[in-house]
Amino acid sequence: MSAKKPLALVILDGYGYREDTASNAIANAKTPVMDALIANNPHTLISASGMDVGLPDGQMGNSEVGHTNIGAGRVVYQDLTRITKSIADGEFEQTPALVEAIDAAVKAEKAVHIMGLMSPGGVHSHEDHIYAAVEMAAARGAEKIYLHCFLDGRDTPPRSAENSLQRFQDLFAKLGKGRVASLVGRYYAMDRDNNWERVQVAYDLLTQAKAEFTAETAVAGLEAAYARDENDEFVKATAIKAEGQEDAIMQDGDAVIFMNYRADRARQITRAFVPGFDGFERAVFPAINFVMLTQYAADIPLATAFPPASLENTYGEWLSKQGQTQLRISETEKYAHVTFFFNGGVENEFEGEERQLVASPKVATYDLQPEMSSPELTEKLVAAIKSGKYDTIICNYPNADMVGHTGVYEAAEKAIEALDESVGKVVEAIKEVGGQLLITADHGNAEMMIDPETGGVHTAHTNLPVPLIYVGDKAVEFKEGGKLSDLAPTMLSLAGLEIPAEMSGDVLVK
């Protein structure tokens, strides 16, 4: 068997591009190798943050998201962005689980109950999603639309619910039907520590309108809670009904849509609506059509509007199906990223996949050893390139990220210089065997060590672009405007392999 000429992807973790050289450890370090590559080789910048990697607009990237996107060859949307995007695209209102539950309630002249954390916090839920659900129920002909508001005050300021409640009172006035039916703090409705007596307060409010307090409007109910010195999180069960209105309780045949997308604080209250529940004695147990926005737990037998997205034909899986060999190699700090996250959350190796782990140094903080284990990692990587065993090699160097996180500028420069030396040896080995190499990053970090706004030490990731450099014999010209999810299709193209249909990323080579 002839020796393989590998295609290697080297991910310099935390190695972003920033024009401003102030407090920029990457620009100011002595990097003769990277300077020569950028002067002489095909290169471009690609996006590694925000919507381009499935995060909210403007949000900095991170290693988990970055490697997931690189390995998937498509943008992998986080729940918040996935649902927000579905609303913008008009797909939300066609979601089968929601359509079925609402239509069944409308047909039987029953109520549609929508509940969730009423907040723009974006951690467990987003009120924009709840707004879309109310509009959808109204558009599909629901006459009784009852909104049950769990109040936040943890991911938002402690007393900030009034704007949200007013927004929904205005929406119901505009629709001419529906109303806010109840208020309760997340302390009760969203417990996650088996404090079932708290959850029971919320359950009894939803199913019996059993409440310590009542109010004619949601805003009036909130003002009364503030007068009792209860912040949003701790607002006691409050039933909302004006004179002459019936209790807005969950009854047989009603639809109930739970609009939280984060599972950990949604599970307990949801389990209270499932047969066989024993957390507390339920005075009533209505036969409702309950829809979870996302899957809160695999063992909860209820409909899910947005089931977990399983990633078929990630880069590693696809290479395996083509009978190709691949190596994943990094030091401890980023080993999970080039294996588990790169494989789309799959723990086990694919056939033909090998893994090598180099131990990260045992130091209190990495500014004390900015080169980390790059010499040992490079030695193993060069040996793998020259071994002729692998079609593809994926390697992550953690230095720019891990030393960037320490905030120690001089150490970050040293980390970048150690990386440069390592990259030089890798480039040499690739040229020697006639292979191909792509150098990139998963997100930025070390290019901004001082926060330009505050003047304080900047230890976080950035939302800046990252480099993409090609080394090899092919006449490559890169397109502009790429992103991390374009790397897998680009690599398959460079290797002369077919690209699976699931990979919606672009090939960045013209």
Swiss-Prot record:
Active site: 63
Chain residues that bind Mn(2+) 1: 401, 405, 461
Cofactor remark: Binds 2 manganese ions per subunit.
EC number: 5.4.2.12
Keyword flag NAD: no
GO biological process, one term: glycolytic process
Keyword Protein transport listed: no
CDD domains (alphabetical): iPGM
Annotated substrate binding sites: 124, 154-155, 186, 192, 262-265, 334
Enzyme class, broadest EC rank: isomerase
GO molecular function: manganese ion binding; phosphoglycerate mutase activity
Recorded catalytic activity of this chain's protein: (2R)-2-phosphoglycerate = (2R)-3-phosphoglycerate
One Pfam family recorded for the sequence: Metalloenzyme
Entry's Gene Ontology cellular component terms: cytosol
Keywords: Glycolysis, Isomerase, Manganese, Metal-binding
Function: Catalyzes the interconversion of 2-phosphoglycerate and 3-phosphoglycerate.
Entry's family note: Belongs to the BPG-independent phosphoglycerate mutase family.
Name of the protein in its database record: 2,3-bisphosphoglycerate-independent phosphoglycerate mutase
Species for this entry: Vibrio parahaemolyticus serotype O3:K6 (strain RIMD 2210633)
Gene name linked to the record: gpmI
